[in-house]
Swiss-Prot record:
CDD domains assigned: FGGY_EcGK_like
Source lineage: Bacteria, Pseudomonadati, Pseudomonadota, Betaproteobacteria, Burkholderiales
Residues the record lists as binding sn-glycerol 3-phosphate: T12, R82, E83, Y134, D241
Catalytic function, reaction form: glycerol + ATP = sn-glycerol 3-phosphate + ADP + H(+)
GO biological process, one term: glycerol catabolic process
Assigned protein family: Belongs to the FGGY kinase family.
Gene name tied to this protein: glpK
This enzyme's EC code(s): 2.7.1.30
Protein name: Glycerol kinase
Annotated positions binding ATP: T12, T13, S14, T263, G310, Q314, G411
Annotated glycerol binding sites: R82, E83, Y134, D241, Q242
Alphabetic keyword roster: ATP-binding, Glycerol metabolism, Kinase, Nucleotide-binding, Transferase
Activity regulation as described: Inhibited by fructose 1,6-bisphosphate (FBP).
Pathway per the UniProt entry: Polyol metabolism; glycerol degradation via glycerol kinase pathway; sn-glycerol 3-phosphate from glycerol: step 1/1
Length: 498
């Protein structure tokens, strides 16, 4: 009997493979970093072959290190950095260019043009998304417009487009498909009809033949090529990283929310089978689709994402050089009692939700001769929490409800100073689970449900366990004053490049 689910977790800076047992516990991990490519200011790319090679290597490595074979694996679940765009040749399987990463801003001016033409409402109504260069649609158009002969080849059906999940499924199995959660991040998918939208494709001049088939997030979608692992393994779960994390956090009921502190920060609120249209610059997105045919049920989410979360700490390490390791930031920040009046707005790539300002830029305010690197480190950590306050406030307005708790995960959730400040500034309890690898766990759960490795969402919920609960301890007056100062600082950072 197969004892494990293999989760493939393809992230912005690394590829990982994680084995989970029946109890939802980690049995083995393998990870390999790969480089980002920055050809021009505001451009961010990946070598799609480097992604595939690293992902295959870690999948094989985790099996080898744990003395397992393909027959020990019940299924594979895939979770991935979303929106990142790959176009490849259907015959050769080779990309026609580097992948354009979700962080890439090269199509910002084109998005401005579409907004000026009055197209923003149409896109929001159909896709639930704001018209921003963050999403895949404008990246696909850019590649078709700028890579020689790409559009003609696409129209002849020679090329395939996919987000990273599609690319991995294609390399693993030869199938060209995606799931509803990833499709909902493209600006091309109607989240109400659950179909690629012809009107939106026409605006971008994207041939429908380029697009993958859309399948459920939980269900046997394909099987791996025999030669990769020695025997075929079912690919039975697919979800974008943030949707997978929400599922892994057992936020299965409407009103439950989670925040993932990764490269960026992403907060999702489950709204059940009802797609709530945001009036506060949030995204309405598909969380997951379970079941097939008439039994299929799609869950929707409100989402807010900020571009700079843990990446701020990386900048403190690599850009400023004030820490040697990312883990050192907590000790440095706690070496001072407060931020000394320093406020940090980390708008290095603009501001995400709820501002959506591509032209904002990073700002450090309140510096005096008494300011030092510890104050900057503390202000940097606090900026992650402040951005998350803006997200939850907007969500509660849209959902017309108050959250009773916020479940957290991702690398920075291990930082107790940040988590306590997050609870204080939100005035909501923050709960960290025992397993913080919830993105990979969510992909594993989706795959496991499809092959009856787990029987139900209720069984998964019963496995979720709390590690630590952070209760708010800040006075209302202090909270109000701090938030007022934060919003003043955001105003200074906005529209800097316009």
């Amino acid at each position: 009997m197969s004892q494990f689910i293999l989760a493939i977790d393809q992230g912005t800076t690394s590829s990982r493979a994680i084995l989970f047992n029946h109890e939802g516990q980690i049995h083995g991990v393998a990870q390999q970093e790969y480089p980002q490519i920055f050809p021009e200011p505001g451009w961010v790319e990946h070598d799609a072959n480097a992604i595939w090679n690293s992902q295959l290597a870690v999948a094989r490595q985790v099996l080898k290190e744990n003395k397992l074979s393909a027959t020990d694996i019940a299924a594979i679940g895939i979770t991935n950095q979303r929106e990142t765009t790959v176009i490849w040749d259907r015959k050769t399987g080779q990309p026609i260019a580097n992948a354009i990463v979700w962080q890439d801003r090269r199509t910002a001016a084109y998005c401005d043009q579409l907004r000026a033409e009055g197209k923003a409402d149409l896109f929001q109504q159909k896709t639930g998304l704001v018209l921003d260069s963050y999403f895949s649609g404008t990246k696909v158009k850019w590649l078709l417009d700028h890579i020689p002969d790409a559009r003609a080849r696409a129209e002849r059906g020679e090329l395939a487009f996919g987000t990273i999940d599609s690319w991995l499924v294609y390399k693993l199995s030869g199938a060209h498909l995606t799931d509803s959660s990833n499709a909902s991040r493209t600006l091309l998918f109607n989240i109400h009809t659950l179909q690629w939208d012809e009107e939106l494709l026409a605006i971008f001049d994207i041939p429908a033949s380029l697009l993958p088939a859309v399948v459920a997030s939980s269900g046997i979608a394909s099987h791996t090529h025999t030669e990769l692992f020695g025997a075929p393994i079912a690919i039975a779960g697919i979800a974008g990283d943030q949707q997978a994390a929400t599922f892994g956090q057992a936020c299965h009921k409407p009103g439950m929310a989670k925040n993932t502190y990764g490269t960026g920060c992403f907060m999702l609120l489950n709204t059940g089978t009802h797609a709530i249209s945001s009036h506060n610059n949030l995204l309405t997105t598909i969380g997951w689709t379970l079941g097939i045919g008439k039994a299929a049920q799609t869950n929707y989410m409100l989402e807010g994402g900020v571009f700079m979360g843990g990446a701020i700490v990386q900048w403190l390490r690599d850009g400023l050089g004030i820490i040697q390791r990312s883990a050192d930031v907590e000790a440095l920040a706690t070496s001072v009692p407060d931020n000394g009046g320093v406020v940090f707005v980390p708008a290095f790539s603009g501001l995400g939700a709820p501002y959506w300002d591509s032209y904002a830029r990073g700002t450090i305010l309140g510096m005096t001769r008494g300011s030092n690197k510890a104050h900057i480190a503390r202000a940097a950590l606090e900026s992650i929490a402040y951005q998350s306050v803006d997200l939850l406030d907007a969500m509660q307005k849209d959902a017309q409800s108050s959250s009773q708790e916020l479940r957290v995960d991702g690398g920075a959730s291990r930082n107790d100073l940040l988590m306590q400040f997050q609870a204080d500034i939100l005035n909501v309890p923050v709960i960290r689970p025992v397993v913080t690898e919830t993105t990979a766990l969510g992909a594993a759960y989706l795959a496991g449900l499809a092959v009856s490795f787990w029987q139900s969402a209720e069984e998964i919920t019963a496995q979720w366990k709390m590690d630590k609960r952070f209760e708010p301890a800040m006075s209302a007056d202090e909270r109000e004053q701090r938030l007022h100062t934060w919003h003043r600082a955001v105003e200074r950072a906005q529209a800097w490049e316009s």
